[in-house]
From Swiss-Prot:
Residues of the signal peptide: none
Tissue specificity annotation: Expressed in peripheral leukocytes, bone marrow, platelet, spleen and fetal liver.
SUPFAM superfamilies, A to Z: Regulator of G-protein signaling, RGS (SSF48097)
Matches recorded under Gene3D superfamilies: 1.10.196.10, Regulator of G-protein Signalling 4, domain 2 (1.10.167.10)
Modified residues annotated as Phosphoserine in this record: S49, S216, S218
Source superkingdom: Eukaryota
Function: Inhibits signal transduction by increasing the GTPase activity of G protein alpha subunits thereby driving them into their inactive GDP-bound form. Binds to G(i) alpha-1, G(i) alpha-2, G(i) alpha-3 and G(q) alpha.
Full protein name: Regulator of G-protein signaling 18
Residue stretches making up the RGS domain: 86-202
Cellular compartments per GO CC: cytoplasm; plasma membrane
Cellular localisation: Cytoplasm
Entry GO MF terms: GTPase activator activity; GTPase activity
UniProt record, GO biological process: G protein-coupled receptor signaling pathway; negative regulation of signal transduction; regulation of G protein-coupled receptor signaling pathway
């Protein structure tokens, strides 16, 4: 009889311990879940607060139904009219350069303006090492046969650059840059002046979304005014 009583007593003790252990674990889980919920709520409030405080969160772009972005331009019609006076006036204005680059992208020939911009930056190089590194990068990206963004150059101009690329100077790409400039001025610039991109600017109309092909990152006109000297820009 004593044995039986002791047996039931042990079972009750075990059950009591198991229930106590379960309650401890269950209670701890509730407490942890409550803490996590409070942390998430606090983080959400902080994010919302930052969005309200920072006006730059609203970018100067608008999304079209097709998923492309159309940049809101602040170019005055008077300024746009000046771009039609000469190709040089177009390229010397940051917004003009950007508009022309967007146009070339619609024709899949942006490598021309990218090469021209790269040459402009190359002429600002300082020191033999920087000249050599940038010259090599430009050559491999725009000049050599089957380059990723090979520009259209005559055989002689291309050969001169190839033969001198091991000992480049600040004027190594002058002839090629001049050639590409002439091609853009005589061909692309004429079509640009008749394009919707330019006509919208000249009439003060909102810019339309532009369908762009997907490409790897390239040197853009937005970096023209504050170009980095790091050769990785063109790699």
């Amino acid at each position: 009889m004593e044995t039986t009583l002791l047996f039931f007593s042990q079972i009750n003790m075990c059950e009591s311990k198991e229930k106590t252990f379960f309650k401890l674990i269950h209670g701890s889980g509730k407490e942890e879940t409550s803490k996590e919920a409070k942390i998430r709520a606090k983080e959400k409030r902080n994010r919302l607060s930052l969005l309200v405080q920072k006006p730059e969160f609203h970018e100067d772009t608008r999304s079209s139904r097709s998923g492309h972005l159309a940049k809101e331009t602040r170019v005055s019609p008077e300024e746009a009219v000046k771009w039609g006076e000469s190709f040089d006036k177009l390229l010397s204005h940051r917004d003009g350069l950007e508009a022309f680059t967007r146009f070339l992208k619609t024709e899949f020939s942006e490598e021309n303006i990218e090469f021209w911009i790269a040459c402009e930056d190359f002429k600002k190089s300082k020191g033999p090492q920087q000249i050599h590194l940038k010259a090599k990068a430009i050559y491999e990206k725009f000049i050599q046969t089957d380059a990723p963004k090979e520009v259209n150059l005559d055989f002689h101009t291309k050969e001169v650059i190839t033969n001198s690329i091991t000992q480049p100077t600040l004027h190594s790409f002058d002839a090629a840059q001049s050639r590409v400039y002439q091609l853009m001025e005589q061909d692309s610039y004429t079509r640009f002046l008749k394009s919707d991109i330019y006509l919208d600017l000249m009439e003060g109309r909102p810019q339309r979304p532009t369908n762009l092909r997907r490409r790897s990152r390239s040197f853009t006109c937005n970096e023209f005014q504050d170009v980095q000297s790091d050769v990785a820009i063109w790699l």
